[in-house]
Amino acid sequence: MDNEDKISISAKEEKILSFWKEQDIFQKTLDNREGCPTFSFYDGPPFATGLPHYGHLLAGTIKDVVCRYASMDGHYVPRRFGWDCHGVPVEYEVEKSLGLTEPGAIERFGVANFNEECRKIVFRYADEWKYFVDRIGRWVDFSATWRTMDLSFMESVWWVFRSLYDQGLVYEGTKVVPFSTKLGTPLSNFEAGQNYKEVDDPSVVIKFALQDNQGFLLAWTTTPWTLVSNMALAVHPELTYVRIKDKESGDEYILGQESLPRWFPDRESYEWIGQLSGKSLVGQSYEPLFPYFQDKKELEAFRILPADFIEESEGTGIVHMAPAFGEADFFACQEHNVPLVCPVDNQGCYTAEVKDFVGEYIKSADKGIARRLKNENKLFYQGTVRHRYPFCWRTDSPLIYKAVNSWFVAVEKVKSKMLKANESIHWTPGHIKQGRFGKWLEGARDWAISRNRYWGTPIPIWRSDDGELLVIGSIQELEALSGQKIVDLHRHFIDEIEINQNGKSFRRIPYVFDCWFDSGAMPYAQNHYPFERAEETEACFPADFIAEGLDQTRGWFYTLTVIAAALFDQPAFKNVIVNGIILAEDGNKMSKRLNNYPSPKMIMDAYGADALRLYLLNSVVVKAEDLRFSDKGVESVLKQVLLPLSNALAFYKTYAELYGFDPKETDNIELAEIDCWILSSLYSLVGKTRESMSQYDLHAAVNPFVDFIEDLTNWYIRRSRRRFWDAEDSADRRAAFSTLYEVLVVFSKVIAPFIPFIAEDMYQQLRGETDPESVHLCDFPHVVLEKILPDLERKMQDIREIVALGHSLRKEHKLKVRQPLQNVYIVGSKERMEALAQVGSLIGEELNVKDVHFCSETPEYVTTLIKPNFRTLGKKVGNRLPEIQRALARLPQEQIRAFMHKGQMVVSLGEETISLDKEDITVSWASAEGFVARSSASFVAVLDCQLTEPLIMEGIARELVNKINTMRRNGKLHVSDRIAIRLHAPVIVQEAFALHKEYICEETLTTSVSVIDYKEGEEWDINGHAVSFVLERVER
């Protein structure tokens, strides 16, 4: 494709964008549907602190398709855009830009100053976002955007929180939660699940000495840094453990029996002492590894605890427990009154309690701790292990699990409501409902919603010195309690507000909400519910539709579900499309640093937004699978789908204008069979599209219309071309024009939601004066039942299957399509052969074969060969496969033909018989010399490849036509221009030209031919003969 084509595509789309804006078409679509049923849509809010990427464009395209379709299908579809403004993504950018990386730096800079800096950068890339949203062809209302940092939005978030609190679903507690040391704040479980990586970590086995020199317990860990906080060991009470003596060291070790070969693979290296049960170990005491917390021994520490979660598939069957740094450890130790110690600060550094490592980052201390244990003869094994480990989704730093005091939403209390809500949601793809999302709901944990950060919605809890709480649910309530006018709810406006009540002073707790809480409250907060627009909000809840990426099953989809189920015992949305992840072409994550992907702007400038949209929509990524992005794939969509469609429109326009066709004059038109077929295919497509869209299955909706473009361009128009060229104003020509006009107009409406630019371009070139101003103001087409002819569609499908089979035979055996052949034999069921007999000439034309023979039996020129399908049959018969192979080789052709008809056969193996189906057999063909054969799902085709002299001469004539018409196109001649030819060629080519002169001249609009004896003009290879032409336009 040349640069001129690319420029024209981009320029045409920009022109359509201008048309939409100048004529305010989006607003007109809303006005057009005012008073119609509302189709409610929630838009997942992006952060404008980063540039949009292909993932955003994909999700935006999916949303746009569904909303455009709903609008064309008779719904009022408001599409408000929203912005996520709070949280770590914004704070982190400000911290980096201002160098506020040290602990306490933000406080020294001033929370007010820091928050105002955050406010300044929130919309850093808003203009770029608007550009890309427009350029991809997505329609949203930027004039009515909602923002999570707006006063009205934040007040509604307070109302949501207060409502949860009033239901007893909010509590303060200490739990082990994912913790980002880079940010100094806890994260939610679903945030921790968003960024796992394969990493190499230490793998150590530690020797814990039992009291009174009773030997050592071996415990394995991948986090040596937690060993300074060890408070207990755990065994499974039902597992069997062993005591052995290491012959080299003389030390006695206790470990799980199943893990023994893992750590002592050499049986001769140890002496067996005996077995003991896990239950017998429970309660025994051991010596602390480090002296830092040995005083806790008096408080039930350093004992062996029972734990039924222990498995022997890895490790030693004995687990080291640091209750401040592991969720299972925390609960087990809490149950047995083991004290909690947490000598790690919010930056991940050891506190003064660990005096030998104070101030050192815990991950950096792993080697030093292992070295010390080795020096003290407490290290049994040291190595590395490769495993998946969670990283902070924003800073890309490793997370830890840490016991912190936090405020929680009691999600586990409403788990049954969430599961019930999920049952009523329609998921696309469907497996996510009970799979990824359903399983996540089943394992849902209480949600840590408090963050000790700055730029966010403050948690509206005021606490007195004696622990009494005031939970505020509105600005009016805060103003009444404080006596102050509230103009902003951010921390630096309300942190100093003190409430005095009943002789007590209340101050706000120093936390803001997890920004996912803002997102989950979006259905209500976007409308300032319940303070404003209550009726509108309730009427649009749950949303009819949402869409985001697969990662949001543990993000936005989840938080929406938590809050909606808790407050209203309903889902937040009825239908959801989940897309997969777009990767770079090499399979890696797209990375600016690696520069491993083309920019979206470059792709749209080169190939157009429609090509990008269709490439994404017609890929596995809309089925929640990963897509390796390829610019060649986008180019292929343009060249193989969109340009042929544009060419079909250009073909119609050229000849309709040439012959003055008026689409309003449809009287006395009798359609040809091929007209009826394309119209039937069109309205069948309308039905399929409607059905797929009702199921929110975009991939199923797109596939058929891509195939229809092939039907239209490569079959209907190509097969009907001569009808359009008819110089006389015949009824047949009018039928062809009328049919093609109807197809193009209706099809422009079918594709409008998916590829809106080319749809608009087609419609604008076809619409009449009284038609709606834009294709997007039209109704989506309805099925016209009387035009759907299933038998005709099946017959045409059979014809095309046969033609495709014949062409594949030609390609396989290097037989040019332009070389005529004498015979083709089509083998199929008697009924289908009888139905196809009347279209033999059509098949002959397509395959360039003189005689088409329809047979219910394979002709004598071909022998059918069958053998076992080893892949399927091997599973059924096992070692009897060779016997079956020999039996099949002995079968006569009559039995094989019977099998080909019935699809089943019985093979005798001695006294035993085995039934075989088509899937058990592979079929091939042995042909007599001069014949070739091949089969499809329904037919066998046998081509007679023998070339006679007349066939050879006609083949030369057809090649001449092809090359002359190629020169016409290259020479930019108009389709109606007449030409004169000067020809230099060998005698055989001259004879072929003379023999088929009338045909050649008619096909190329040639009026005269001169044979010259010298080379002139462009040279071509015509079936092995060198030929040169000169073409000259002839004035009429």
UniProtKB/Swiss-Prot annotation:
CDD domains: Anticodon_Ia_Ile_ABEc, IleRS_core. One of its GO terms (biological process) is isoleucyl-tRNA aminoacylation. The gene is ileS. HAMAP family: Ile_tRNA_synth_type2 (MF_02003). It catalyses: tRNA(Ile) + L-isoleucine + ATP = L-isoleucyl-tRNA(Ile) + AMP + diphosphate. Disulfide bonds: none annotated. The lineage of its organism: Bacteria, Pseudomonadati, Chlamydiota, Chlamydiia, Chlamydiales. A motif ('HIGH' region) lies at residues 46-56. It is found in: Cytoplasm. The keyword Translocase does not apply. This is Isoleucine--tRNA ligase.
